[in-house]
Amino acid sequence: MFKHILLPTDGSELSEAAIRKGVQFAKSIGARVTGFYAAPEFHVFTYQTEMLEDTKEQFAKDSRARADRYLAAIAEAAQAAGVGCDTVRVTSDHPYEAILEAAQDKGCDLILMASHGRKGLRGVLLGSETQKVLTHSKLPVLVWHGDEAQLSPRR
């Protein structure tokens, strides 16, 4: 059975619901979890380079705060369930690659993540990190398709 589960999050409500299910699953099989968040790289196109340094620093600060908030939620859920947990925060424009790398580096034997279930052209245009993980992972991937109709809208 699985002993170490990677739980990637993008901070969405669906992802948060998958994290809760992932922690419950980990508890039921005696596994530990690693929470994971990939923050985007800083990209700006401007001719006013004197503004960039402050903007970049603020972007990094905001990204760290967001990651810390998402990862703290995973750690708290795991602690409440009595499940061992550590967290990983990286910066990457290619979250699926970072997810796969973290799973390997941490010795995970399962990746459990949410899917928004976008289909057709919308799914292709928006891209699906879950789909990319599924097609590139050498590890098993458990995809949680929550009922988005039951989730409350983001404010």
Regions found by a protein language model. Give the residues of each.
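Short, well-ordered secondary-structure micro-motifs
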Residues: A18, F45-Q48, E97-L100, G123-L125, ...
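Structural beta-alpha unit
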Residues: E76-I111, E148-R155
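Short, acidic/small-residue loops that bind anionic groups at enzyme active sites
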Residues: H136-H145
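Glycine-rich, Arg-bearing micro-motifs that act as flexible, cationic patches
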Residues: L110-H136, Q150-P153
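Short, hinge-like loop/turn segments at secondary-structure boundaries
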Residues: E50-D54, A103-K106, E129-T130
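Small/aliphatic-rich secondary-structure junction motif
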Residues: K3-D54, A77-A81, D86
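Acidic, proline/glycine-rich short linear motifs
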Residues: A38-R69, Q150-R155
